[in-house]
Amino acid sequence: MNKKVLTLSAVMASLLFGAHAHAADTRIGVTIYKYDDNFMSVVRKAIEKDGKSAPDVQLLMNDSQNDQSKQNDQIDVLLAKGVKALAINLVDPAAAGTVIEKARGQNVPVVFFNKEPSRKALDSYDKAYYVGTDSKESGVIQGDLIAKHWQANQGWDLNKDGKIQYVLLKGEPGHPDAEARTTYVVKELNDKGIQTEQLALDTAMWDTAQAKDKMDAWLSGPNANKIEVVIANNDAMAMGAVEALKAHNKSSIPVFGVDALPEALALVKSGAMAGTVLNDANNQAKATFDLAKNLAEGKGAADGTSWKIENKIVRVPYVGVDKDNLSEFTQK
C-alpha cells in the first residue's frame, strides 16, 4: 500500500514538474527602470495582470532601481535563465545599444517600452521593437486642455494682460517625454493665439516630493503672486505642486499634469487639479506583453492583436482629461 502511495506521489510530482517546465518554456524577462515611479508602478501591475491571464507564460520581473548597470546585470541573468523574449523599460535610453547586443548574442527578441531607444538602435536588430507614445502629442493635448480652460475662466488672468504667466515643473532633463512635453505645451498655446510668459522652469525629476519643494520655493519667491497656471510634465509632480499650493493657501491656481494616475483623477474630481492627459498605462502594458509573448513563441510581433506597428513601433494615443469627461476614466 505504501509503495503504491509513493508511486502515485512520484507520478503526481512528475506531472506537476512537467507542467511547471512547460510554463517555463515561455519565460519572458521584464525590467522596470524603478518600481517606485508612480506611472511605471501602474504599468508594471498591468503587465503582471496580463501575465496571469496567460498560464503558458512565466514573467521574470526585475526592479532596476534607477541604475543602468544593475539593469544590464539583470538582463545577463535573464538571458542565462533562457528567457524567450525581453521586455525592457530602460533606465537610460542611451543604453539600448548595449541591451540589444546582449539580446542579439542569444538571438532573443527585445521589446523596449516607455523609454524610447534611438532609431539607430532599433534598426540595428531585426528583433527589436518599441511600445510607447508620441511624446509631442502629450504636450499638444496638455496645451489644448490649458487653452480650453483659460478661455473659459477669465478670472485666471490675475493681472488682466491676456497672457498666461506660468511655472513649469519638468521631468528628467534629456528624457524624450520631458523635452517634448515642455516644448509642445507652450508651442500649442502660442499656436492657438494665447501669449505666454514663463516665470520659472525647473526639473523635479518626475518626483512628487521634489516638485513640492520647487513649488514651495516659487511660492516664497518674488513672483509668488504672479503665477496664474502651473504646468507639470507628469501627475506625480503636479501632485507635489498641489500640496505646496494648499500649504500657501493658493489652491485656486490651476494645475495641469500628464498620466491620469488614479490619485490625479481624484484631484481633478475635487477641483485641486484642473486637468491631466491620459498616458494609457493599461494599453502600453498590454501591447508590450502581447508583442513579447508573440515574439517569445516565434510568431509575428502583432499576430492575433489589433496593435498597429509602424517602423517597429507601437504608439498608444494620449487623451485629455478634465471634469467634462472624467467619468469615462474613473469607471475603469
UniProtKB/Swiss-Prot annotation:
Pfam families: Peripla_BP_4
A single GO BP: chemotaxis
Location(s), subcellular: Periplasm
Residues that hold beta-D-glucose according to the record: 37, 114, 175, 177, 181, 234, 259, 279
Keyword terms, alphabetized: Calcium, Chemotaxis, Metal-binding, Periplasm, Signal, Sugar transport, Transport
Amino-acid positions noted as binding Ca(2+) in the UniProt annotation, renumbered to this chain: 157, 159, 161, 163, 165, 228
A single GO molecular function term of this UniProt record: metal ion binding
Function according to Swiss-Prot or TrEMBL: Part of the ABC transporter complex MglABC involved in galactose/methyl galactoside import. In addition, binds D-galactose and D-glucose and plays a role in the chemotaxis towards these two sugars by interacting with the Trg chemoreceptor.
Name of the protein described by the UniProt record: D-galactose/methyl-galactoside binding periplasmic protein MglB
Protein family per UniProt: Belongs to the bacterial solute-binding protein 2 family.
Chain residues that bind beta-D-galactose: 37, 114, 175, 177, 181, 234, 259, 279
Presence of the UniProt keyword Metal-binding in the record: yes
Residues of the site described as Interacts with membrane-bound trg signal transducer: 97
Record text about domains: The calcium-binding site is structurally similar to that of EF-hand proteins, but is in two parts, with the last calcium ligand provided by Glu-228.
Superkingdom as given in the UniProt entry: Bacteria
